[in-house]
Amino acid sequence: WYRIKTSFTGIKRLVTLPQEDKDACVNAYKFLQRMQGGEETTTEDETKAIAAYYKVLNNMLSVFDLEKLYIPPQLDEKEGLYGNQLLCEQAMLKEMALQDPEKSHLLDMGCGRGRIAHYIASMTGGQVSGYNIDPDQVENAIDWAAETQMSERLHYKVGNHHDPLEYESGLFDGCYSVQAVWPFFKKEELDDHAREMFRVLKPGTRYSCSEYLLSPYFDWNNEEHVSLHRSYLPTLAATQSMYPA
């Protein structure tokens, strides 16, 4: 029933979305294509395009039962997409090495619809705060937390990753991101964001992530490699993701 309801809600949201939002999504994709084609763009315009694109994309994918908007590594070939997502999230949680999971308060950078935060909080028994640029996804995350009676432990906020994080220093017992940080920052911007994540973490705690990188077999001198890479990035609304493994 949950899957049917999710698909129905996604269809309803798509049908009722204002035409300007749909147009903004298409224009955002075209913008990202031009950017990968070599057009000079600003961080501000890139960020606006990402928000406009994901506002529609998250509802489209929910129709097909994909609410966690990431492709996990294949940790177990016997498991499907969802099963490997759970394994990936379990591995991230283990990497954070929480001292007292039930009393922990974690930060989910780029939380999307809040499904990962929900699963992490279910495993720890503690709290998770989610931060995301798209108000539509944050609204969905808040609704899901309320529906599952997790509102007291799941907290969501709309915010721009490129700005200082709207949290006090030393607040969190751990931080994680799932394909939601590295693809959207230029190399020189990653250091600034890393400093912000470091600022809001308690001393001695960890940041864990699952991010996609270029494999050692990628060849920048191979035109086919480069062409496929640049044509793929706009589909994810990724601005960069050009970092070697």
Regions found by a protein language model. Name each.
Residues 191-206:
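A short glycine-rich, Lys/Arg-flanked "PGG" loop and its adjoining helix->strand segment in the class I
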Residues 105-107, 117-163:
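Class I SAM-dependent methyltransferase SAM/SAH-binding core
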Residues 79-102:
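Conserved alpha-helix/loop element of class I SAM-dependent methyltransferases that forms part
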Residues 110-114:
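Class I SAM-dependent methyltransferase "Motif I" SAM/SAH-binding loop
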Residues 173-188:
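A short SAM/SAH-binding and catalytic strip from SAM-dependent methyltransferases
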Residues 1-63:
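N-terminal auxiliary segments of SAM/dcSAM-dependent transferases
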Residues 163-175:
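A short acidic, Gly/Pro-enriched loop at the edge of an enzyme's catalytic core
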Residues 209-237:
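Short, glycine-/aromatic-enriched active-site segment of Class I SAM-dependent methyltransferases
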